[in-house]
Each structure stands twice: as structure tokens, then as C-alpha cells.
Amino acid sequence: MPREDRATWKSNYFLKIIQLLDDYPKCFIVGADNVGSKQMQQIRMSLRGKVVVLMGKNTMMRKAIRGHLENNPALEKLLPHIWGNVGFVFTKEDLTEIRDMLLANKVPAAARAGAIAPCEVTVPAQNTGLGPEKTSFFQALGITTKISRGTIEILSDVQLIKTGDKVGASEATLLNMLNISPFSFGLVIQQVFDNGSIYNPEVLDKTEETLHSRFLEGVRNVASVCLQTGYPTVASVPHSIINGYKRVLALSVETDYTFPLAENVKAFLADPSAFVAAAPVAADTTAAPAAAAAPAKVEAKEESEESDEDMGFGLFD
């Protein structure tokens, strides 16, 4: 079958990306740095039936989206995020589930000299199994060691590389000698596009409990500000009513003015002993039946033992 020319390929690519943007209401913009063709094939196979992965040149993706803005203006939000080595992951499934599947398809990778570290690398304290001739190599990296049974032992954990640092040749060589693969590469979600809205992938970590607690925190903050400024809102009115009632009650106690709800408070302040005396009486009334029941149980037990003896069921008979 003859290979299609470049113009036909471009036309088909534009049609494909437009069709996917229309058919799928949700997608991820993903970074594909350090992802090889073999790993990309594995990702496509593991997510088959759930997602469609589309890669391509940024200029072509932007051109296709700009040409479709008249039909779908919300797609304009995607344009500022199409830069670098990126692609699209289209889906109709739950976004959190697909995110977890993408994370599961990351593969460990060795450190390469000149690469930018995506995470912090710490070498743990351990016996390296390397001979004493490598001691100068560790000293050059500032790693404290000792010779133990003819091999080099690292005495404490060492932060070798910081996030964002360029991996040096010495660091890469050391990690390879220790068989440490500190990095993991895969498709990295940079932005989430969901029914016309675009947001950071961290939003997917928000649970209903988190949203509920944040909402209540906001309500408390609004109520506090409104109470301090005297501006009534639904959040602050209940507190304003309670505070007002407390002030009226305090005024009633200090003056001759009274109302039914204040009578009990005034009576308590006038004679607290009357309320204290009521508690022991209630306790005595509940304790009396229990005390009366105890002798009755003892008497019943004694009668039962006597009847057993009368019937001749003694232990040594």
C-alpha cells in the first residue's frame, strides 16, 4: 500500500484531533519527556478501550484547535498549555481512575549525566560491596565512608541530587555502581480539561470530605468577619441572635426588667442551693430500689441452697 503524502497526512491529523475534541468531553494534557516509543506502546495497550492517546507537533495541534474555535470556543483554553513535548489523553471514564492508571505505567530509569532530576535523590546508608580502591570516588562526592570487612560502607544517608538539578557524571556513575534507578518516567499530567473547564491535576486529589471541611472553614470565616463588621449574612445571623439574647439576659439580671426565659436564671442566682439540693434527692431515689433488690437476691440464694440440701444433693453424699 503506497504511503500517503504529507498534505494528506496533515489533513487526516486535523480531522482526527477535531473529531476527538468533539467526541470526548474530557482530556489530559500530558508531558512525554523521556518516554520512549516502547513505553508509549505499553501505555496505549494498558489503557486500550478507556482512552485515546494522541501525540503530535505543537504547531499542528494549535492550528487544528484554532480552526475549530468557531464551533467550540471553550477549546481556546487549551492553547496556552500546548508547549514542550506534550500530547492529549482523551477519555470518557473517571478522571481519577485514568490518572492512577497513568501513574501505574511509570517505569524506573537510571540517572543519566546531563539529565534534569525530576525528584530528590538520596543514597541510603549501606554496605556498597565495592572494594577499597573506590574510596577516593566517594570522597570526591563528599560521602563519609569506612572500610568494613574489605568493602566500602556508607555511614549515613546522603542527599546526592536535588530536584531540578542537572545530574553530573560522578553522580550518575555512583548511582549506576550501586544499582540505584532513582527516577521514574511516564506520561505526566500537566492540565485537566473537563467539559470546557481547565484546571491543575492536583484538583483530582480533592475528596468530598476535603471539600466539605474547606466549605465549613469558609463559612466560619465569613461569619467571623460579618460579626466583627456588623454586616448580617445567613452565616452570621444565628450567632448575632445568640449574642443578642445573651446581652438581653445579662441586662435582665442586672435590672428589674424580666421575661419568662430569664426567670430560671434569676432564681438560680438568687438561691443556688435549691438547685444543688435537687441532685442528691434524685440520686437517692434511684439508689434505693437497687439497695432493696440486693438483700432480696441474697435471701433467694440462701433459700435455693437450703432446698438443695433438703433434697439430698450434697457434694459428698
UniProtKB/Swiss-Prot annotation:
One of its GO terms (biological process) is ribosome biogenesis. The keyword Ubl conjugation applies. It comes from the Eukaryota. It holds the Pfam family Ribosomal_L10. Gene3D superfamilies: 3.30.70.1730, 3.90.105.20. This is Putative ribosomal protein uL10-like. The modification Phosphotyrosine is found at Y24. Residues 292-317 are annotated as: Disordered. There is a cross-link at K297 (Glycyl lysine isopeptide (Lys-Gly) (interchain with G-Cter in SUMO1)). Residues 302-311 have a biased composition (Acidic residues). One of its GO terms (molecular function) is large ribosomal subunit rRNA binding. Belongs to the universal ribosomal protein uL10 family. The keyword Phosphoprotein applies. The modification Phosphothreonine is found at T59. Keywords: Isopeptide bond, Phosphoprotein, Ribonucleoprotein, Ribosomal protein, Ubl conjugation. Ribosomal protein P0 is the functional equivalent of E.coli protein L10. P0 forms a pentameric complex by interaction with dimers of P1 and P2. One of its GO terms (cellular component) is cytosolic large ribosomal subunit. There is a cross-link at K297 (Glycyl lysine isopeptide (Lys-Gly) (interchain with G-Cter in SUMO2)).
